[in-house]
Amino acid sequence: MSGVLRDGVSNLGGGFGSSDYADTITIEARRAMADMFSADPSEISFGQNMTSITFAVSRALANTWAPGDAIVVTSLDHDANFTPWVRAATEAGVEVRIAEFDLATGELDPSAIARLLDAKVCLVAVCVASNAIGTVVDVASVGAMAHEAGALVYLDAVHAAPHRLLDVRAFDCDFLVASSYKFFGPHAGILYGKLDRLAALEVYKVRPAPSDPPGKLETGTQSFESMAGITAAVDYLAALAGSGPGSRRERLDRSLSLINDHERSLSERFLEGVASLPEVRVFGVPTADQRRVGTFALGVTGHGAEAVAAQLARVGLYVWSGHYYAVNVMDRLGVHDTGGLVRIGFVHYNTATEVDRALEALADL
């Protein structure tokens, strides 16, 4: 990223050195994200962030809706995969149906969505993994059911990206969004869309902008330094498995498998430790298995979430408190009005020692 800013780039398509550099950066970033998603580079677009992209896509899709149609959203999602769709549906006079996650387990069973599907539903929007309580959703099953009902599928993979190998072909989704800062890159948003879906989408754009995907979805001049950072982040993830043979996609597969194993070990250690702290309650899936990632929402009896986070910060452990934009999750759990929950998460660079430090800090409250 610093090299791009230091060396300088121009806009795309100029036919001179600094413009050619921007072209190369863009091409390489599309290839990198195509490898990460198991997609084609022509199906990858970039934007400011996932939220901005979702607002743009929701407005474009809403122009194809009519009164009598319906959409399905969920109570498990980050608000960026909820409010843009609800606002678009409200403005289009379209019914909003909400699939609820299970309060006891934190899981969103595909059957909760299936019950809401009929010929009226034109879109299902759901997360791959919850940013609040760590639940992993069986989005392949959701996609199959939604498509059978004639609906499009829009997946929020922001929270899943650093924890799970993403495969848009296996998911059979129409759209998928992610944010590169979540997988250790710069602040930017990435959109995958099936090529025919992108081509048919009437997006809001200025007249000189490209009329074909993927460029038609990229409003204004993009952050080329961020695109370079995205490529570097994908290469970093691919390198975690070592320098063995295979394509970048194959190396990503190996890396994410190692990450998954390591994070499961940390999660098991954390859950075993928390079980000995009767004042601490973990919300969501209670075991460290494929139904969750290593993201835990906690309530501590007698202590507000903000106070707990502040105490952990004093011993060098930085965790979130509140709702983390998962407003519906906190509402459904009944904790939104009391300050939300503490969120503690583990990724590939965390250690067992850090898990123990977190447990000790919770025990000392």
Where would I find each of the regions flagged by the language model?
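Pyridoxal 5′-phosphate
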Residues: M1-L365
